[in-house]
């Protein structure tokens, strides 16, 4: 039984138009993740094509959620813009926000974590984390989808590399969900 992320998760990629966002969007789609939109302020109205399917880009998370029914976001924006991106997702009342970006100032992280707690709705994983995966259902972040298959185990790890290693070592058993949260992450 997957937790927090499953085949019904509808995912927004914040920063999808940037090189990292685009690269990892392609990889997440190839893993079966339902990417429903991208968000990049000032680039709303565009669309990017992945595996021959266009993915619309919006200026705000609220616009993307209204148009697509999204409930999850993954953040691939520069550290200087991460706080604003995460606050946008919290204000739109998404269920889960996965912050991949590293180098986010501690004060910015504290501010968006406090806002998420105040909202009572949005769960934050990250920043500076590899993300979350429910194998053969959805993969949000940068965890390789090929290192393990589905199963009954759950994993929460403070280390990205050890997340991958544990998933690989226990691949014959498989995972319901694995979360790489890194040291200062807030779940």
Feature names for model-found ranges:
Residues 13, 37-40, 57, 99, ...:
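General beta-strand structural signal in soluble alpha/beta enzymes
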Residues 16-17, 39-44, 79-80, 99-105, ...:
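Short, ordered loop/turn segments at secondary-structure junctions
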Residues 25, 61, 86-90, 167:
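Generic hydrophobic/aromatic pocket-lining and core-packing "Φ" positions
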Residues 27-51, 127, 181:
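NAD(P)-binding Rossmann-fold cofactor-contacting core
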Residues 66-72, 76, 80-103:
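Rossmann-fold NAD(P) dinucleotide-binding segment
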Residues 102-125:
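Rossmann-fold NAD(P)-binding glycine/threonine-rich loop
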Residues 148-186:
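Short glycine-cluster motifs
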């Amino acid at each position: 039984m997957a937790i927090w992320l499953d085949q019904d998760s509808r995912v927004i990629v914040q920063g999808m138009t940037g090189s990292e966002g685009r690269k990892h969007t392609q990889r997440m789609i190839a893993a079966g993740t339902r990417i429903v939109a991208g968000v990049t302020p000032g680039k709303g109205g565009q669309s990017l094509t992945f595996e021959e399917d266009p993915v619309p880009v919006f200026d705000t998370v609220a616009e993307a959620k209204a148009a697509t029914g999204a409930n999850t976001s993954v953040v691939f924006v520069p550290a200087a813009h991460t706080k604003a991106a995460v606050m946008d997702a919290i204000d739109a009342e998404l269920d889960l926000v996965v912050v991949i970006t590293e180098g986010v100032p501690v004060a910015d992280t504290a501010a968006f974590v406090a806002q998420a707690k105040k909202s009572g709705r949005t769960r934050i994983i990250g920043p500076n984390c590899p993300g979350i995966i429910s194998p053969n259902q959805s993969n949000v972040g940068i965890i390789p989808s090929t290192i393990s298959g589905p199963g009954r185990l759950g994993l929460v790890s403070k280390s990205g590399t050890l997340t991958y290693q544990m998933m690989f070592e226990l691949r014959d058993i498989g995972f319901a969900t694995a979360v790489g949260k890194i040291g200062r992450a807030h779940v």
